Amino acid sequence: MKFGFIAKHRGIWPTGWLCGALGVSRGGFYAWLTRPRSQRSRSDENLRTKVRASFLASDRTYGARRVWRDLLTEGIACGLHRVERLMRLQALKARPRRRRLPPDPGQRQTAAVAPNMLDRTFEAAAPNRKWIADFTYVWTAEGWLYVAAVIDLFSRRVVGWSMSATMAAQLVTDALVMAIWRRGKPDALLHHSDRGSQYTSEQFQRLMADNGVICSMSRSGNVWDNAAMESFFSSLKTERTGHKTYRTRDQARADVFDYIERFYNPKRRHSTIGYVSPMEFERQAGLA
């Protein structure tokens, strides 16, 4: 460890001074410097590069387990603990999660129009059986940008989304319209959301009724009833929007689009579906 420290910093301080400060001889250091590296050391160096490449490709969002899964997919045999060690050595840390901003109580209501039929069963045996929905907000210098999304619990794929400067019913309606357009008119589909006025609005309820969608809603004030949706928005903010400053809503809108359509759906490894991306999970299921 001492010789490694000297090798790393001898371009900053004189080698002799470093050796004296650490209590080692210059001869010993140069002998260590010229000895052949072990096979393990060479292997670690090659793997360090691949670990870092996977981490950076995820926009610095992957922890050791997802990086490890990336490497296994590429045919690189290595252990999870080794990946953890190499990430520590390079100070590669996934961004910490931030708390979601509290919702505006003026836009929520307590009167449910539907019971909680999902009942926290966040799995689906087939596509287009269970969709979950909600919206969140992203701050810009122009004000809030509201982001609505619809997720298929079968693959955790974002099948519909919408963005607007206001959180009117049209915001969530447009997200559901996109989901139906992408996936086709559903058959025996359960749609779960909270009790927000957007989802209880006549406009949104009529869209669901016209398409034969069964409505399910969380209990009042219980975020765990839609925990999978909360998890997606937490990932969006942790991995993309939470550490950025947007000058305009259009800039934020483009970045959210990029996160959903170019990273989350096609690339991001999801623990719930075996550490593959939503689109890859659907491909393996024969849907692509």
Q: Model-flagged regions — what are they?
A:
Residues 1-288:
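Charged DNA-binding/catalytic regions of mobile-element recombinases
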